UniProtKB/Swiss-Prot annotation:
Major subcellular site: membrane
Disulfide bond annotation, renumbered to this chain: C49-C65, C142-C207, C172-C186
Tissues expressing this chain: In adult, detected only in bone marrow where expression is restricted to a small population of early myeloid cells.
Residue stretch(es) of the prosequence: 19-20
Stated name of the protein: Cathepsin G
């Protein structure tokens, strides 16, 4: 466990690699039992993302959070402490959406199949996913949680939360060349200094206790609005993928397998 703590410390000290919840506050410990912290190893080095438990054996995150190996920490509040509630699970299989495009960041969604099932507890449990009959509307108030930096110069190792409102699609279409209202959500009032940013990527946008979006990208300076992947548009793919990859828990390997479906 000690090497992992050292790696987490390294990640949190990297300004460009660590994520930001801007304008938020510290969350009540373990009030977001679906939250996952992802420690990612890639040829470029170490990075961190958010994610969220959607079934005992699957975490949902952003497709751009892929690496050669991923460790998932569930049940955490302070990611630099060895909390009794924490469950550290390696990823067996990373399944990017087959139409993910890193050039325009479209279809930025990925399922992570865990090497073993998470144990449900008061600090670890899945979040609900959206139904087709209920759609987000501009003005809806939602919550984003994540670890990382809270400003350009100040970091944190405890889970942060911020409330953000859904915006009109046109606002993001005016700011981001490749914004697609069919598969993305525009979130965050530009008149407020509140946003999710960068390493918070992969974390959930939760509205009325349902995960509706995934932190995807925003402006370089973190000013809102930001773009979130619209989970509802990908529900057929999510359900099909989780059915296809039946749980097969194996001993840890040095690298994870990658699949598309």
């Amino acid at each position: 466990m000690q090497p992992l703590l050292l790696l987490l410390t390294f990640i949190l000290l990297q300004g460009d690699e660590a994520g930001k919840i801007i304008g938020g506050r510290e969350a009540r410990p373990h009030s977001y039992p679906y939250m996952a912290f992802l420690l990612i190893q890639s040829p470029e080095g170490l990075s961190a993302c958010g994610g969220f438990l959607v079934r005992e054996d699957f975490v949902l995150t952003a497709a751009h959070c892929l690496g050669s190996s991923i460790n998932v920490t569930l049940g955490a509040h302070n990611i630099q402490m060895r909390e009794r509630t924490q469950q550290l699970i390696t990823v067996l299989r990373a399944i990017r959406h087959p139409d993910y495009n890193p050039q325009n960041i479209r279809n930025d969604i990925m399922l992570l199949q865990l090497r073993r099932r998470a144990r449900r507890s008061g600090s670890v449990k899945p979040v609900a996913l959206p139904q087709a009959s209920k759609k987000l509307q501009p003005g809806d108030l939602c919550t984003v949680a994540g670890w990382g930096r809270v400003s350009q110069s100040r970091g944190t190792n405890v889970l942060q939360e911020v409330q953000l409102r859904v915006q009109m699609d046109q606002m993001c279409a005016n700011r981001f060349q490749f914004y697609n209202s069919q598969t993305q959500i525009c979130v965050g009032n530009p008149r407020e200094r509140k946003s999710a940013f960068r390493g918070d990527s992969g974390g959930p946008l939760v509205c009325s206790n349902v995960a509706q979006g995934i932190v995807s990208y925003g402006s370089n300076n973190g000013n809102p609005p930001a773009v979130f992947t619209k989970i509802q548009s990908f529900m057929p793919w999510i359900k099909r993928t989780m059915r296809r990859f039946a749980p097969r828990y194996q001993r840890p390997a040095n690298s994870l397998s990658q699949a598309q479906t």
